[in-house]
């Protein structure tokens, strides 16, 4: 399947994501240092906008969108996207809910082993 939508990536992401999007026919603009002012001028030209935690998608930005279908967060939370404003414009908001699952599991296991060692030395 191939798509023709334009994608704006507003924050630094792994090159693999950019490659996958391009290989599927999406037109990708990778602007990891885009300023809020520049984003306000450009957001209306894109069907998909991808952010991490640096960029905040406000109600004012969402109101400027004319083509946007998806706001995507590469990460767990959605606190930097005004989800109510997106819903009001029928823009789908998605995130990587399970993105940190392995890292959290590794941390928990590591801390458990650390505390087990401490208990054994008592």
Predicted regions and their residues:
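N-terminal glycine-/charge-rich "phosphate-binding" loop or analogous flexible N-terminal tail
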Residues: 1-46
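Extended, polar beta-sheet/loop recognition surfaces of beta-rich domains
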Residues: 122
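Phosphate/diphosphate ligand-binding glycine-rich loop within oxidoreductases
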Residues: 9, 29, 35, 48-119
């Amino acid at each position: 399947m191939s798509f023709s939508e334009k994608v704006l990536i507003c924050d630094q992401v792994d090159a693999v994501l950019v490659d996958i999007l391009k290989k599927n026919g999406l037109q990708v603009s990778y602007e990891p240092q885009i300023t809020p002012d520049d984003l306000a001028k450009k957001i209306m030209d894109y069907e998909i906008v991808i952010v991490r935690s640096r960029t905040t998608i406000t109600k004012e930005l969402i109101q400027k969108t004319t083509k946007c279908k998806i706001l995507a967060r590469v990460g767990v939370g959605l606190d930097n996207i005004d989800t109510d404003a997106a819903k009001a414009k029928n823009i789908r908001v998605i995130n990587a809910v399970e993105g940190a699952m392995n890292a959290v599991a590794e941390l928990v296991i590591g801390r458990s082993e650390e505390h087990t060692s401490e208990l054994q030395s008592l």
